Design a protein with these regions (language model features):
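Aromatic- and carboxylate-enriched substrate-binding clefts and catalytic-loop regions
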Residues: 150, 283-538, 573-579, 585
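Solvent-exposed beta-strand/loop surfaces of large extracellular or lumenal domains
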Residues: 77-90, 354-357, 622-641, 746-770
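Catalytic core of carbohydrate-active enzymes
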Residues: 420, 441-449, 463-464, 471-481, ...
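Short, well-ordered beta-strand segments enriched in hydrophobic/aromatic residues
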Residues: 55, 63-65, 101-109, 596-599, ...
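Catalytic and substrate-binding clefts that recognize carbohydrates or anionic sugar/phosphate headgroups
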Residues: 94-251, 261, 267, 274-279, ...
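C-terminal motif of bacterial Sec signal peptides marking the signal peptidase cleavage site
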Residues: 24-25
Length: 876
């Protein structure tokens, strides 16, 4: 941190020492009790101002610092900071003849009165003792450990290295210049909005259809936001949303599967895609139609286009109607940069609106900072297509980065705002929705992100988990990546099906699950075209996504409330653990609050993926194998193609979809509570709302669940549903699925006996609860038998692998007759089901036999090749 010199005479008498390790007058200061205010009460929170300086306490961890030589302070919303009213903050102001000291529970700001523009000689901020990281800041100091933000696009990147298809383009092989984020390990951040663009009106006043417009700032002003948080990164993100606004909750369908391919699909071909998904019982929510929906041939269309190609889509209305009948959403690709040529259907209407002569046939240029053009483009060009049934736009801006009229105005940022906020004002029945690239700070308000055209390589797969989670550091928590990569390194390459499978398995645990690829006949990513080795795993990844939809949607609500995104770096939860920052483990991330994902980013060796994983403190349940692992250590784990490294905190309650679904359109789907092993008290929630209305901020419902153990009894409480919304079902069907337990001896629901189903291959008990009254609390009590062996030591994985391998052995040796000990291992699941009274002895027998597997294979008299195959295949 930069050091400064002693300030001025009289400094010590004021109790302030700039440039030293402490600001004496601030030490141990506490807010006065009378400054406490209800959080719901809003205020400007201006703490102090004079003719040139103004300080606003946004929260105890955020102070806004403004300087203007004429005293014309900025109350307009900016592109970053759209909110100017805040929950009332707790702070104290102390003044001497020379100094003003503003104290919160986290920091103390000291400023020399009347000293003009902020410098290291007249302004300082010191951390209070409550922070986990001490610091003293002066203007000019720069944090040394920024944790990163995000970047506009991954177009042309192979992993983090840039390689344009045009080899003459500069920058080949350069590292992606990831932008800084909000968070630093130094414990503080300064956001400089001094040159940031403004709005000329309140963007949250939706009473008018007219969009507040861009406004440039005065020169030579200072507008800083100082954030103090120590290592409480989650609080910092929440504080950021107090002035930058919240992360909107996307429609529920966003969290389903998206099918996308750059391909000149016809109406009939698109319908066949839908039918294929239905035939293979693969859920689907969003169809993405790339640029061939409009004319692309010279004289009728091109890169930009707004007129349907009626050779491919004879009746767009009927095509869109078909999608609605199948509960599917559709987005169309837009490239607005080339303007609106005379051959577009709506050219005449827009020309007249803009005062041009339609007979001139002059192309109407794209002119984003012209409010007349933007209003005409939105109303005359896009709105008719939306009325036909287009749900949202894929805005694929790849051209000029900045506006011609206002050089500081990013075309990407501005388009995101204009389209998204126009929907807020003109489509009150649905949530705004947009799919576009990152435009810069403040773009967290305009999801969803489109990360662009990456190469289909293991390097690209390896980079995306880190890139994705790190974007949470600027609140940009909804990146959508081209799963499987967009393009080959060499056009004639073939799809690497293993790579695509691992990418899809990652996609299950990303904010958006969307396949996409360029126009290449070898890029066939339809699950049913992947062959028997990979199709089951890819299909399972999509179904698992839908199973987790209630958990994902609940976590998305959390992002709206707190600013903490669905995928978040490990240092949010484990800020004092060095491993959380270690580049070796940077691909690991938390998926919501209960799941840790450790992506597989390298090809298998001999059919096995080995992954080195850091598990934080605590107990973690490996879902692929049913293994409970002790945290606080680095482990190496092995996985087959149908397995993926996901770890759930011990005792977690995860709301999941309780039945097979085709899409996420319904509010009435059954919910299953997945309860994971762990003799701990724990709690979980299920969030629900209408799914796509605008009232989710107030109209929603939450149900809380708790579990605890009392000896051999597990008690699960279902809380009362609190809240309501339009379309809420009167009752909902529930089930409970408890992992890693033996078959219970008794199950009571509100004191009455109920049946259960035991699933031995998963070591799971499934209890159907029917439709419990949501206005009452309910108690589920499960009693387990005494004397049970340990079940959460990998048995589930061993069961599955043994069964599969023994089946494969019959194809290697059709005459094989499994010997005693080995044969029983292949039918363990059935034995547990048929002979529940022998549960403990059968489990013990399996474990003993498994421990002696090499000897049993010798007893079986397998050939050396077959013995090695067997051991390798079960990952012995």
């Amino acid at each position: 941190m930069k050091k400064t010199n002693l300030l001025f005479s009289g400094l010590l008498s004021s109790g302030l020492l700039f440039g030293s390790l402490a600001i004496v007058g601030c030490t141990d200061s506490k807010p006065d009790a009378e400054t406490t205010n209800p959080e719901t009460e809003m205020s400007t929170n201006i703490a102090w101002q004079d003719s040139q300086a103004r300080f606003t306490v946004i929260a105890d961890g955020v102070i806004r610092m403004e300087y203007d030589k004429d005293g014309q302070f900025c109350d307009n919303p900016s592109f970053i900071a759209t909110l100017r009213q805040y929950p009332k903050a707790n702070f104290t102001v102390k003044e001497t003849e020379q100094m003003v000291l503003i104290s919160t529970s986290k920091m103390c700001l000291s400023y020399k009165k009347g000293s003009g523009k902020f410098t290291a000689d007249n302004l300082a901020i010191q951390a209070e003792a409550s922070l986990s990281k001490s610091f003293t800041w002066h203007p000019g100091d720069t944090p040394q450990n920024n944790l990163g933000g995000t970047y506009r696009t991954l177009d042309g990147y192979d992993g983090s290295k840039y390689y344009s298809w045009d080899h003459n383009k500069p920058g080949q092989g350069q590292e992606l210049p990831l932008e800084d984020g909000i968070l630093t390990r130094d414990g503080w951040t300064l956001l400089d909005d001094s040159k940031g663009l403004l709005f000329d009106g309140d963007v949250n006043d939706l009473s008018s259809a007219e969009l507040p417009w861009v406004k440039e700032r005065k020169d030579d002003t200072i507008d800083w936001y100082f954030m103090a948080y120590g290592h409480d990164y989650k609080q910092a993100l929440h504080d950021y949303t107090l002035f930058a606004d919240r992360i909107p909750l996307p429609p529920r369908y966003v969290f389903g599967y998206w099918w996308s391919r750059y391909w000149s699909y016809s109406d009939a071909e698109m319908r066949q895609v839908v039918k294929d998904f239905q035939e293979y019982a693969i859920p689907l929510d969003v169809l993405v139609v790339d640029m061939d929906w409009h004319w692309v041939e010279p004289g009728k269309g091109g890169w930009t286009g707004y007129t349907w190609n009626d050779r491919l889509f004879p009746s767009p209305e009927k095509f869109l109607q078909y999608l609605k009948q199948n509960n599917l959403q559709i987005t169309l690709n837009l490239h607005p940069a080339d303007g609106i040529p005379a051959y577009e259907d709506k050219y005449g209407q827009l020309a007249e609106y803009l005062g041009m002569d339609p007979l001139s046939k002059e192309t109407i240029p794209y002119d984003g900072s012209n409010p007349k053009f933007m209003r005409g483009w939105l109303d005359k060009i896009l709105l008719p297509l939306q009325k036909q049934g287009v749900d949202f736009w894929w805005l694929d801006w790849q051209q000029q980065l900045n506006d011609n009229r206002i050089p500081a105005l990013s075309n990407t940022w501005w388009l995101n705002y204009c389209i998204f906020d126009n929907q807020r004002r003109t489509q009150p029945e649905h949530r705004p929705m947009l799919y576009h690239r990152w435009g810069g700070m403040g773009n967290h308000r305009y999801q969803i992100g489109f990360s662009g055209d990456t190469y289909s390589t293991w390097a690209s797969l390896a980079y995306q988990p880190y890139f994705n989670a790190t974007a949470s550091n600027v609140g940009y928590g909804y990146w959508s990546h081209d799963l499987g990569g967009h393009m080959f390194v060499n056009y004639n390459d073939k799809l690497d099906r293993e790579l695509y499978t691992r990418w899809m398995q990652l996609g299950t645990y990303l904010p958006v699950m969307r396949s996409h690829s360029t126009k290449n006949a070898n890029m066939q990513k339809e699950p049913w075209k992947l062959g028997s080795e990979f199709q089951p795993a890819v299909t399972a990844s999509i179904r698992q996504r839908y199973k987790l939809a209630p958990y994902i949607y609940t976590t998305a609500r959390e992002a709206y409330e707190t600013g903490i995104s669905l995928c978040r770096p490990l240092y949010y939860d484990y800020p004092e653990a060095e491993e959380a920052y270690d580049p070796e483990f940077r691909n690991q991330y938390m998926f919501g609050s209960q799941m840790l994902v450790a992506p597989i980013t390298e090809p298998m060796v001999d059919g096995v993926s080995k992954v080195k994983i850091w598990l934080p403190e605590g107990l973690w349940f490996e879902t692929a194998t049913g293994t409970m692992l002790q945290g606080g250590q680095i482990v190496e784990r092995r996985f087959l193609i149908d397995e993926y490294p996901v770890y759930v905190k011990a005792g977690s309650i995860i709301p999941t979809t309780g039945s097979d679904v085709k899409n996420l359109a319904s509010c009435s789907d059954k919910v299953c509570l997945d309860i994971y092993p762990g003799n701990v008290e724990s709690e979980g929630q299920y969030y629900e709302d209408n799914g796509n209305d605008r009232d989710y901020d107030k109209k929603y419902a939450v149900t809380t669940f708790k579990t605890k153990y009392e000896g051999k009894k597990q008690i699960i409480n279902l809380g009362e549903r609190k809240g309501s919304y339009n379309g809420m079902p009167a009752r909902r069907s529930y089930s409970v699925k408890i992992y890693g337990v033996p078959a219970p001896t008794e199950v009571l629901l509100d004191g009455k006996s109920v049946d259960c189903t035991y699933i031995p291959e998963e070591l799971v008990v499934l209890i159907e609860l029917g439709e419990p009254d949501p206005e009452c609390e309910h108690s589920l009590q499960i009693t387990y038998p005494e004397g049970m062996p340990e079940l959460n030591n990998g048995l589930v994985g061993q069961f599955r692998r043994m069964k599969n391998t023994m089946t494969q052995m019959k194809y290697r040796d059709a005459g094989i007759n499994f010997c005693e000990g080995l044969g029983e291992m292949g039918s363990i699941s059935e034995a547990l089901l048929y002979f529940p009274e022998e549960f403990a002895s059968r489990i013990q027998q399996f474990q003993d036999n498994y421990n002696q597997l090499p000897q049993l294979l010798d007893k079986q008299k397998l050939s050396p090749e077959n013995k090695q195959f067997f051991l390798d295949d079960v990952l012995y």
